[in-house]
Amino acid sequence: MNGGILLSAPLYQMIYTDLKKQIEKGNYEINDLLPTEKELAALYSVSTITAKKALDLLKEEGYILRKPRKGSVIISNRKNESTF
C-alpha cells in the first residue's frame, strides 16, 4: 500500500502528454487542427472540462493556438518554437 497516495497523473495531464508526443512525432503538422474538446472527450472517455484542461496546457506550452469556434491549431512541433 502506498499510504493512500495516488501515483498516477491526472487524466488531463495524460491526455496532454499523449497529444504532445503525437505533435512532436509529426502525427500532426503545423497548421493542422486538433480534435475538438468534444471529440477528445469521446476519444479518451473523459469530460469536456478534462479535454479542455489538456488543450489549455498545450497552449501554455506553445504547441497550439486556440481559436474560438475554429478549434485548436498546431503552431509548433517543439516546445516554445511557434511560427508566430
What residues fall within each predicted segment?
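Short, hydrophobic-biased segments on the C-terminal half of alpha helices
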Residues: 54-56
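Extreme N-terminal segment that seeds HTH/winged-HTH DNA-binding domains in transcriptional regulators
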Residues: 1-49, 63-65, 78-83
